[in-house]
Amino acid sequence: MKRILCWHFAADDLKLGYRDGRKIQAGRILSVEGTPELCLHGMHGSRTLLNALDYANGSQICRCEVWGQVDKGSAKLCGTHRKTLWIIDGTNLLHEFACRCAEDALALADNPDSRSVRAIEVKRLWVRGLATRTELAAAWDAARDAAWDAARAAARAAAWDAARAAAWDAAWNAARDAAWAAARDAARDAAWAVQSRRLAAMVSAEHKRAK
C-alpha cells in the first residue's frame, strides 16, 4: 500500500488532541477506525511544511507517512494510519524563520519603521535568553502600533504586520503569522515559494544537526 510522505506539527507535549491523548513517538504508527474525513476524523498531515504550519498547534515538527484510506484536500490530507519517522523540536527554528520572513517584508518597504526593526532584534535576543518576556511584549506592542500607523499604506502595513507577528512568544504562531503577512502584499506565489524553500532548508539542517 502506497505511503504518502507528509509533515505534521504536533503539540509540545507530543500528545494527540481532541481527547485522544496518545503519544506521538518516532517509529510509532497511530491509526484510527472508520473512514477518514478531513478536519473531522483521521491521521492528518500536509505535503509541504508551510501548509502543515498553517494547522500547527505546537512546535514539534514531525516527518510522517500516511496511508490506508486517504482523504485529500488542497493543503492537507488524512488517512487511516500515520507513522512518525522522526521528530525535531522546532521552537527556536520557527522563531528564526518568523524573523527572516519579517525581514523580507521590511526589505520591500521604504523607510522601515524603527519599532518594527526593533521587534525583530528583541525577538532574537529573547530566544537567546538575553531579553525578558516583558521586553518582548513591549516590542510587540510597539510593532503593533507601527502596523496601525501604517494601515493606510497597504505595502507598508504588510511589513509592519510581519514584524509584529515575528514578536509573538509562541514559535508556531509567530512563524505562521509572519509568513502570511510577509506574502500578503508581495508577489504572493513567489514569496510563498521562497518561504517554503527556506523553511524546508532550515528543518533539513536542524534534523541533520540533531542526528
Task: Describe the function of each predicted region.
Residues M1-K211:
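Short, glycine-biased loop/turn motifs at secondary-structure junctions and
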